[in-house]
């Protein structure tokens, strides 16, 4: 660990013209992998933070809002989620949340960057909380696109696919995983009542990228849910798009959500029946241009 002797700050770009400035107290990791720049630092306001290619991915103090919102609406909406595929999510927090559901028998996490996974195991224990060692976990270091294509050839099937990738506009690593064609492959990988959910960046600063992801999901799934949640360390509300082949997350009551969470032994800090209803009724925030 390198202590920061003077004021060093991270400037995270929110858009091409706006940045979030964050004071760094200590640097644990600063390196470039084969695929991206990796930074793990300590900050006052957000705690230990993972940064990839200058974009914050997760921070100790607020990561639950992102990961619980990404995972639980989809997994809870499915009545019997047994097999779950996670694309991305190298720090292990998405895997952690998936494994809270005792119905899950197999959770496959596929991340292209093995350095992120190994560094997260060492420096981000509060995020993964031992999820990598759970006997239900299967961690694969490979391109998510290639994994999905090969899984289709093998005849694999999943109940839920969770896409916890870098933003569609932040780097080139995951761009091909946001295309309509790829969502079509995901649809084929799902069982007949399967669900996919993806983070979709920010609809305010990058409306075109968000709409591209949304239309890709809409073109392949009959049931759609759009929702968002404010993430302080991101400096914006992150958007999510859920696509379902049968089960509608809007149809669940708060009581039914709480019942499923209780029956499955899920202990969440943010997500609940009331939170589910709120998320499903959250408007998508976009710029309102007045001339």
From Swiss-Prot:
Enzyme class, first EC level, given as a word? transferase
A Gene Ontology term for the protein's cellular component: cytoplasm
Positions binding spermidine in this chain are 67, 91
Annotated PABS domain ranges read: 5-245
The cross-references to InterPro entries, in alphabetical order and at most eight, read:
PABS, PABS_CS, SAM-dependent_MTases_sf, Spermi_synthase, Spermidine_synt_N, Spermidine_synt_N_sf
Task: Give its E.C. classification number.
Answer: 2.5.1.126, 2.5.1.79
Q: Which residues does the record give as S-methyl-5'-thioadenosine binding sites? A: 36, 111, 143-144
List the keywords (alphabetical): Cytoplasm, Polyamine biosynthesis, Transferase
Catalytic residues? Answer: 164
Task: Report the locations given in the UniProt record.
Answer: Cytoplasm
The subunit structure is: Homodimer or homotetramer.
Q: What does this gene product do?
A: Involved in the biosynthesis of polyamines which are thought to support the growth of thermophilic microorganisms under high-temperature conditions. It seems that long-chain and branched-chain of polyamines effectively stabilize DNA and RNA, respectively. Catalyzes the irreversible transfer of a propylamine group from the amino donor S-adenosylmethioninamine (decarboxy-AdoMet) to norspermidine and 1,3-diaminopropane to yield norspermine, and to spermidine to yield thermospermine.
Family per similarity comment: Belongs to the spermidine/spermine synthase family.
Q: What is this protein called?
A: Polyamine aminopropyltransferase
User: Which organism is this protein's natural source?
Assistant: Pyrobaculum aerophilum (strain ATCC 51768 / DSM 7523 / JCM 9630 / CIP 104966 / NBRC 100827 / IM2)
């Amino acid at each position: 660990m390198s202590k920061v002797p003077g004021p060093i700050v991270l400037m995270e770009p929110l858009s091409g013209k706006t940045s979030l400035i964050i004071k760094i107290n200590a640097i644990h990791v600063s390196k470039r992998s084969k695929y991206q720049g990796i930074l793990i630092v300590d900050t006052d306001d957000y705690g230990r933070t993972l940064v990839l290619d200058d974009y914050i991915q997760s921070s100790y103090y607020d990561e639950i809002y992102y990961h619980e919102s990404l995972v639980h609406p989809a997994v809870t909406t499915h009545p019997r989620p047994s097999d779950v595929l996670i694309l991305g999510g190298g720090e292990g927090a998405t895997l952690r949340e998936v494994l809270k559901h005792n119905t899950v028998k197999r959770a496959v996490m596929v991340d292209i960057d093995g350095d992120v996974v190994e560094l997260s195991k060492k420096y981000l224990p509060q995020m993964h909380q031992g999820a990598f060692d759970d006997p239900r976990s299967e961690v694969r270091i490979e391109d998510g696109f290639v994994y999905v294509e090969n899984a289709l050839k093998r005849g694999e099937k999943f109940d839920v696919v969770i896409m916890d990738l870098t933003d569609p506009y932040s780097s080139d690593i995951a761009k091909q995983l946001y295309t309509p064609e790829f969502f079509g492959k995901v649809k084929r990988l799902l069982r007949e009542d399967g669900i996919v959910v993806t983070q979709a960046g920010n609809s305010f600063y990058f409306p075109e990228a968000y709409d591209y992801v949304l239309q890709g999901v809409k073109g392949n799934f009959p049931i759609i849910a759009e929702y968002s949640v404010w993430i302080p360390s991101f400096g914006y509300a992150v958007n999510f798009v859920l696509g379902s082949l049968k089960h509608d997350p809007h149809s669940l009551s708060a009581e039914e959500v709480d019942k499923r969470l209780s029956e499955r032994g899920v202990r969440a800090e943010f997500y609940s029946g009331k939170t589910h209803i709120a998320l499903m009724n959250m408007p998508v925030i976009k710029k309102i241009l007045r001339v």
